[in-house]
């Protein structure tokens, strides 16, 4: 048996390589990171070959971040292009089996770290590549031959990235004419449960996986060739609500895979029992109550959203396999779904996108909304966002007037009720109690609004304040 300079075991899944224990970082938010699997004829593959283009591990400087691309070629009698993304998604699994090597995300968002301990035992990426290929061929026996090329040189990584994005785009377009109502089964994926134990990823024709790497066709291909693998069939069951995308079969699997933490998942709802979020999602949505709208921020965006929070902070709040009302992780291709958060207004509820994300998905944004959705070039805080939405006449602005009318009606009703209530006024004058003031200066312009709140007072005692002698 081949020996490797690090241990290999599923027990290392979920292992984090922290910054203080890191030798080098590959890809991630500070650089480029890519993984791609291509099906090739058997005679074009040199089995188990590892090629490194650019600096190898021993030539890298400790603590630095380097661009990174992994291109795997696979071959076999049963290998076909439909399996590429399925095999590609298992890269996350098998790399994390390697002690001291951390892998996060997918496709063009790959983020890896090699620990100091592991780097001290190997001076090249070659044994790492051989270990990953061994795991692939052991776990997925339909792969008969495999080779990999690692790129660490900036220009080469950029070149591979450009080619890969076209491949990803072609894959994603396959599901555009297929919808949830056209099929009898959906597919589930548990790949992210090593990092998010209660995550339940449901893939339907109208909802791509959170990582963006698995669509409905990919799930079908994976379940067919690897029935015991992380992608599996989900019987839809009965449709409970077409608008929210609630199915009995999805609810059953949600309860089972989350160990009872969740009993329902609504595929196309943002607020009511939303899809769980793992951490590998490409984009995170966030509710902005001040404008009653939803903003979205992608992983690559390094700035702040109008709520004063960046992607990494929101991702930490959203991920972990939880249902967090007000936050939602999605795959970018979900923007192209005709059922995109349809239970909560769809595109009419979207008020803010980073310009890089807006440009990327501009062809799916409804024509009448393209100039009404703000970017960081139009708005950097809540007040400027409000002004922009009012100026452009965004659909959410109409809800503000309705809310204000409702508040005014409630205030009038309260005034009438107070006026009608009998009150015994004391003979002597009295002073209403003053509101307690916050220490430390100005209150900061904080306004508290209670909506639909019922306050019951059992007894009110009004007493005359006596002067001290």
From Swiss-Prot:
<dbReference type="GO" id="GO:0043884">
    <property type="term" value="F:CO-methylating acetyl-CoA synthase activity"/>
</dbReference>
<dbReference type="InterPro" id="IPR038571">
    <property type="entry name" value="CO_DH/Ac-CoA_synth_bsu_3_sf"/>
</dbReference>
<keyword id="KW-0479">Metal-binding</keyword>
<feature type="binding site">
    <location>
        <position position="280"/>
    </location>
    <ligand>
        <name>[Ni-Fe-S] cluster</name>
    </ligand>
</feature>
<comment type="function">
    <text>Part of a complex that catalyzes the reversible cleavage of acetyl-CoA, allowing growth on acetate as sole source of carbon and energy. The alpha-epsilon complex generates CO from CO(2), while the beta subunit (this protein) combines the CO with CoA and a methyl group to form acetyl-CoA. The methyl group, which is incorporated into acetyl-CoA, is transferred to the beta subunit by a corrinoid iron-sulfur protein (the gamma-delta complex).</text>
</comment>
<dbReference type="GO" id="GO:0016407">
    <property type="term" value="F:acetyltransferase activity"/>
</dbReference>
<keyword id="KW-0408">Iron</keyword>
<dbReference type="GO" id="GO:0043885">
    <property type="term" value="F:anaerobic carbon-monoxide dehydrogenase activity"/>
</dbReference>
<dbReference type="Pfam" id="PF19436">
    <property type="entry name" value="ACS_CODH_B_C"/>
</dbReference>
<protein>
    <recommendedName>
        <fullName>Acetyl-CoA decarbonylase/synthase complex subunit beta 1</fullName>
        <ecNumber>2.3.1.169</ecNumber>
    </recommendedName>
</protein>
<feature type="binding site">
    <location>
        <position position="192"/>
    </location>
    <ligand>
        <name>[Ni-Fe-S] cluster</name>
    </ligand>
</feature>
<dbReference type="GO" id="GO:0005506">
    <property type="term" value="F:iron ion binding"/>
</dbReference>
<feature type="binding site">
    <location>
        <position position="189"/>
    </location>
    <ligand>
        <name>[Ni-Fe-S] cluster</name>
    </ligand>
</feature>
<keyword id="KW-0484">Methanogenesis</keyword>
<comment type="similarity">
    <text>Belongs to the CdhC family.</text>
</comment>
<feature type="binding site">
    <location>
        <position position="278"/>
    </location>
    <ligand>
        <name>[Ni-Fe-S] cluster</name>
    </ligand>
</feature>
<dbReference type="Pfam" id="PF03598">
    <property type="entry name" value="CdhC"/>
</dbReference>
<keyword id="KW-0808">Transferase</keyword>
<dbReference type="InterPro" id="IPR023432">
    <property type="entry name" value="CO_DH/Ac-CoA_synth_bsu_arc"/>
</dbReference>
<keyword id="KW-0411">Iron-sulfur</keyword>
<dbReference type="GO" id="GO:0006084">
    <property type="term" value="P:acetyl-CoA metabolic process"/>
</dbReference>
<dbReference type="GO" id="GO:0016151">
    <property type="term" value="F:nickel cation binding"/>
</dbReference>
<dbReference type="InterPro" id="IPR045822">
    <property type="entry name" value="ACS_CODH_B_C"/>
</dbReference>
<dbReference type="InterPro" id="IPR011254">
    <property type="entry name" value="Prismane-like_sf"/>
</dbReference>
<comment type="subunit">
    <text>Monomer. The ACDS complex is made up of alpha, epsilon, beta, gamma and delta chains with a probable stoichiometry of (alpha(2)epsilon(2))(4)-beta(8)-(gamma(1)delta(1))(8) (Potential).</text>
</comment>
<dbReference type="GO" id="GO:0019385">
    <property type="term" value="P:methanogenesis, from acetate"/>
</dbReference>
<keyword id="KW-0533">Nickel</keyword>
<dbReference type="GO" id="GO:0051536">
    <property type="term" value="F:iron-sulfur cluster binding"/>
</dbReference>
<comment type="pathway">
    <text>One-carbon metabolism; methanogenesis from acetate.</text>
</comment>
<keyword id="KW-0012">Acyltransferase</keyword>
<dbReference type="InterPro" id="IPR004461">
    <property type="entry name" value="CO_DH/Ac-CoA_synth_bsu"/>
</dbReference>
